[in-house]
Amino acid sequence: MTDNPNKKTFWDKVHLDPTMLLILLALLVYSALVIWSASGQDIGMMERKIGQIAMGLVIMVVMAQIPPRVYEGWAPYLYIICIILLVAVDAFGAISKGAQRWLDLGIVRFQPSEIAKIAVPLMVARFINRDVCPPSLKNTGIALVLIFMPTLLVAAQPDLGTSILVALSGLFVLFLSGLSWRLIGVAVVLVAAFIPILWFFLMHDYQRQRVMMLLDPESDPLGAGYHIIQSKIAIGSGGLRGKGWLHGTQSQLEFLPERHTDFIFAVLAEELGLVGILILLALYILLIMRGLWIAARAQTTFGRVMAGGLMLILFVYVFVNIGMVSGILPVVGVPLPLVSYGGSALIVLMAGFGIVMSIHTHRKMLSKSV
């Protein structure tokens, strides 16, 4: 008696990838533990964090049930909604810490720029899937317009860090479509030539100051350099095994700013040490490798470039946050994915993982349609 190779397993029926789900749950538990410490054992914040995790998991499960071809069909509508929301932010968005990035609808407050991190790669993947790969020069130009329209709207908030990530979320999808290295080389040269224009004419004074603080934070230890100095102290004092959960001096004595959001990695490093850092990095590596494996097995161009693009941008999120907190990159306000406190970012990330699981678990259906 032999097993039926076409027989669906439980995970096939619920359209979830158990390996990815297990890694995600481990990261979310890790996040909850560090948030509890970073918040000073704030019960209210912890309750909200658990609610965000629960909502994120529900959205991921729901998104995983929807076939990839539906996402491909929805992409233009989501993209248009995203553009409208970004314009709405510019018109009557809520101002926080000098930036106009939020829409406050009374019952919910969110950042439309987070939606762009899903809407842009979806739209570019849909556009690419309807063309031969690699895309023609004309269609590459159209794809770039689709990428940079929302990017410029986010940059105008101003939010340079998020705008770069939005651009990269689309550019990675375009890269995975098989662009020639010659074209990529030309793009790199153009970007390099644009940097002086960005520095002298487009960046705000505080953004330039952040870059300068990267070189010499001690020049303003109580002002612009304070964040990175305190973060370095926290990371360096953690040692091999850390000071112990809930026993970090920089975090518990509130020397470390934004310790539950952008600088949560410093809290983790101080309290759990190098061992805790390596566990976190191992989970991220496993998650990204699993996502790239799913991308490699996808049966359509849409599935391949979408899953691959989401995993590459996840790597960039992790790299930028850890680099920022460690003092090797400027402070740009990028949270640590799946770990930092924040509902909008977590829900969008979990939605992205739901799409990746959908691409994986619907691959048999896709192979029949090709």
Curated annotation (Swiss-Prot):
Reactions mediated catalytically: [GlcNAc-(1->4)-Mur2Ac(oyl-L-Ala-gamma-D-Glu-L-Lys-D-Ala-D-Ala)](n)-di-trans,octa-cis-undecaprenyl diphosphate + beta-D-GlcNAc-(1->4)-Mur2Ac(oyl-L-Ala-gamma-D-Glu-L-Lys-D-Ala-D-Ala)-di-trans,octa-cis-undecaprenyl diphosphate = [GlcNAc-(1->4)-Mur2Ac(oyl-L-Ala-gamma-D-Glu-L-Lys-D-Ala-D-Ala)](n+1)-di-trans,octa-cis-undecaprenyl diphosphate + di-trans,octa-cis-undecaprenyl diphosphate + H(+)
Residues annotated as transmembrane: 20-40, 50-70, 75-95, 112-130, 136-156, 160-180, 183-203, 263-283, 312-332, 336-356
Free-text activity regulation comment from the record: No effect on activity by EDTA indicating that the activity is not metal-dependent.
Catalytic activity, EC: 2.4.99.28
Domain of life of the organism encoding this protein: Bacteria
Topological domain spans for side Cytoplasmic: 1-19, 71-74, 131-135, 181-182, 284-311, 357-370
Positions in the Periplasmic compartment: 41-49, 96-111, 157-159, 204-262, 333-335
The keyword Glycosyltransferase appears for this protein: yes
Main location: membrane
NCBIfam families assigned: PRK10794.1 (NF008060), rodA_shape (TIGR02210)
Family: Belongs to the SEDS family. MrdB/RodA subfamily.
Protein name, UniProt field: Peptidoglycan glycosyltransferase MrdB
Organism, scientific name: Escherichia coli (strain K12)
